[in-house]
Amino acid sequence: GAVISAVKIVSRTHHEPVAVGRDAVFRPYWQNGKPVLMVLVVGETARAQNFSLGGYPRDTNRDLLPYAGDLFYFANTVSCGTSTAVSLPCMFSAAGRRDFKPGSEVYTENLLDIFARTGYRVLWRENNSGCKNNCNRVETETFCRNYACKDEILLKDFVARANALAGNALIVLHQQGSH
């Protein structure tokens, strides 16, 4: 079962990750000459049906309202699994939900690699159970283990860290959410 699968993954002979998205290029969306800063928040048990950004009638995202014009809300998303170990690597994989093979993230590039290759600085900030091999090749900051701190820790020195990245940047905030 699971032990045999883990041994197969670890014993693979790939030393360099299998490349994906080699033809990807950065095309600026905004024509203002300023660097792009994207922040992607991923986390646990955030029920889309309860987000006012997605049309829920209660005001559940009040603090984000001043920024609503600058946000992209991904409404048509489906999880690849019910565990972080499966859903997180699948989310960043080029394979897609139907073709994703758990364990392939160990030896295959992902979305973060593509961003880095197209000139983005990539930073993964974490207060959850680890990046599940998504952040192996990018800068990573882990704030606590075993759910010992709240999600707001991910904002510690956020502006300074974002400014220090200089140029186009992607910051992933992997929150523990409502564990």
Regions found by a protein language model. Name each.
Residues G1-L40, T45-H179:
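Active-site-proximal alpha/beta segments of enzymes that process anionic O-linked groups
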